[in-house]
């Protein structure tokens, strides 16, 4: 659509206009993917590199299977983080990994307004300690890319993710 089409509010019969504002969700995922592709193009990132080579906290990942924890056959690769095949999961109550991520998320939210909010690095380390819900590369699950973003930032030596994204986007 190169102009405008449809209704902004069907009940009120209000049409979409050129300046209609929309909420956009999950936009850090494509931005992180573009940043990773730029780093790959510059020779600074290998998509098939183990994440643990960049973020050591991911070196000892475990996979939950039948209520027990196992060492996966292979590590999480950068490609897995971007393709959502890492085994990482959003907060939920059905799996051991999901419950662990729920606790991490609750702590991060509780500390948000404190003097010690959870840093991106700390969040990646805490997520790395959570069990995976499947072995890397064996399945797909919609999940965010904070670890991928943190790995990209770590690889470039940048400290602040927002600054890195702004530089990657040319702003």
Tell what function each PLM region has.
Residues 1-15, 47-49, 114-117, 128, ...:
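A short, well-structured edge-of-sheet supersecondary motif
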Residues 2-4, 92-97:
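Short, solvent-exposed loop/turn and secondary-structure capping segments
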Residues 12-18, 104-108, 125-134:
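Short glycine/proline-rich turn/loop motifs
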Residues 18, 23-27, 39-93, 129, ...:
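Active-site helix/loop module of the DD-peptidase/beta-lactamase fold
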Residues 30-35, 144-152, 167:
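Short amphipathic alpha-helical face segments that pack within enzyme cores
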Residues 78-82, 111-135:
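Alpha-helix-centered segments that form part of catalytic cores
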Residues 96-114:
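Amphipathic alpha-helical interface segments
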Residues 138-144:
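Cytochrome P450
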């Amino acid at each position: 659509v190169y102009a405008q089409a449809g209704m902004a509010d069907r009940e009120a019969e209000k049409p979409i206009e050129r300046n209609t504002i929309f909420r956009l969700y999950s936009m850090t995922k494509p931005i992180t993917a573009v940043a990773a592709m730029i780093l790959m193009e510059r020779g600074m990132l290998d998509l098939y590199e183990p994440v643990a080579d960049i973020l050591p906290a991911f070196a000892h990942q475990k996979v939950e299977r039948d209520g027990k924890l196992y060492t996966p056959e292979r590590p999480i690769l950068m490609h897995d983080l971007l393709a959502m095949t890492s085994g990482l999961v959003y907060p939920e109550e059905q799996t051991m990994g999901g419950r662990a991520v729920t606790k991490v998320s609750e702590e991060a939210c509780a500390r948000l307004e404190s003097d010690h909010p959870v840093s991106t690095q700390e969040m990646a380390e805490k997520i790395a300690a959570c069990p995976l819900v499947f072995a890397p590369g064996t399945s797909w699950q919609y999940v965010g890319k904070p670890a991928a973003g943190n790995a990209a930032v770590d690889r470039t030596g940048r400290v602040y993710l927002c600054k890195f994204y702004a530089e990657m986007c040319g702003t």
